[in-house]
Amino acid sequence: CRLGAMSVTVADVVAALEAAYPPQLAESWDKVGLICGDPDDGVSRVAFALDCTLEVAQAAVESQAQMLVVHHPLLLRGVSSVAVDTPKGKVIHTLLKGGVALFAAHTNADSARPGVSDKLAELVGITPGRPIKPVHLDGIDKWGVHIPPADVERVMAALFELGAGEIGTVSYTHLR
C-alpha cells in the first residue's frame, strides 16, 4: 500500500495476512494463501468467514467486498476440477465473476502467536501457552546477541522466561 495513495491491492492484504500468519507455520497437508483472484486488483472492503460456502461467496459479492478471508481452505483435498457445474467450482466462479479474491489462513493462523488458538483459549478463560508443535521459521529462530558480561545471567533468564532457547522438549539451550 502506498502511503497517501489509499490504493490497497489484494497483494497488500495477502502480505499483511502472511506477516501475521506466516505460511511456513501451516501443516504440510494444508492449503493456505491466495486461492483465487488477481494480486493487482484493488481492495477497499474485505469480508471474513470461517468457511467459504456458496452462500458466503454470494454474500461477499452482494456486500461489494473485493476480498474474502476464510479460516478453512476451500480446496483442501480431492478437487480435480473447478468447473462451474461442480460444488467448489460454482463457489470459485461466483467469487471470480463478482470480483472477489479468496484467501485462507488455516493451520498457520492456528499456530501463529497471537493466533486463532490463543484467542479461543482467552475466550474460555485459559491463558494461552505455547504451540503444541512449535515450528521454527528460517531467519527468526536463531539470534546472535552481544551482552555485557555483568548482564549475561539477567538477560538470559529474561529470554528463557519468554520461551527462547527451546528446542523440542529441551529448554534453556544457548551457546556462549
Feature-to-residue mapping (PLM):
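Hydrophobic structural segments
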Residues: L3-R176
